[in-house]
Regions:
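Short, well-ordered secondary-structure micro-motifs
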Residues: 14-15, 37-40, 64-69, 98-100, ...
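Active-site/ligand-binding-proximal alpha/beta "capping" segment
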Residues: 44-111
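Catalytic beta/alpha-barrel core
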Residues: 1-12, 24-35, 54-59, 66-67
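Surface-exposed amphipathic alpha-helices with a cationic face
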Residues: 19, 42-46, 77-83, 144-152
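Glycine-rich phosphate-binding active-site loops on the catalytic face of alpha/beta enzymes
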Residues: 5-10, 108-133
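Active-site loop-to-helix "anion-binding N-cap" substructures in soluble metabolic enzymes
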Residues: 8-20, 154
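C-terminal helical cap(s) of enzyme catalytic domains, especially alpha/beta-barrels
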Residues: 123-156
């Protein structure tokens, strides 16, 4: 899967080229992009011939400074309502705080996210990038276990831990 980072969401030369590939594309929402702009960027890929597009909500820039970004869970639900595309939620970038990843992951699943993108590293303090917002392996296992009940309550088993 090829990932279009948030800052390249409206790089139309890149999107035009990616539309010609036969590889799945994860389109991250820009930090200041409206949902409509995000969906139109996805449409750019689709109309160029690539039907393998997934949307990724990774938080937006707001006035809040306590978190790296503000995870827009309404955008997850709205994208599901307005589009046929799968929606991925990235609570790592959406919060920038490992302590919030579990609760925001559960909220994203409740909002309709089809998948989660979570930063994990064996030793986050030594990670070359995104270490401050990464989970270590035991933390990741705990988050995954915490998803089992909400997934069952929603009547789905999307990647649910056993």
């Amino acid at each position: 899967m090829l990932q279009v980072g948030a800052r390249n969401m409206q790089n139309f030369a890149l999107l035009r080229r990616l539309a010609t590939t036969k590889k799945p594309i994860l389109l991250k929402r820009g930090p200041s992009a409206m949902v409509k702009e995000w969906l139109l960027a996805a449409e750019y890929l689709l109309s160029g011939g690539n039907g393998q597009v997934a949307l990724c909500e990774r938080g937006i820039k707001t006035f809040e400074t306590a978190t790296r970004n503000t995870m827009d869970l309404a955008a997850v639900a709205l994208a599901k309502e307005l589009s046929h595309l799968p929606v991925v939620a990235d609570p790592s970038h959406g919060t920038g705080k490992p302590s919030l990843i579990g609760s925001v992951s559960r909220a994203a699943i409740a909002a309709g996210a089809d998948a989660l993108l979570i930063e994990v590293h064996r030793c986050p303090e030594r990670a070359l990038s995104d270490g401050a917002q990464s989970l270590d392996l035991p933390q990741f296992e705990a988050v995954m276990q915490s998803l089992a009940l909400p997934l069952r309550a929603l009547g789905t088993s999307k990647g649910a831990p056993a």
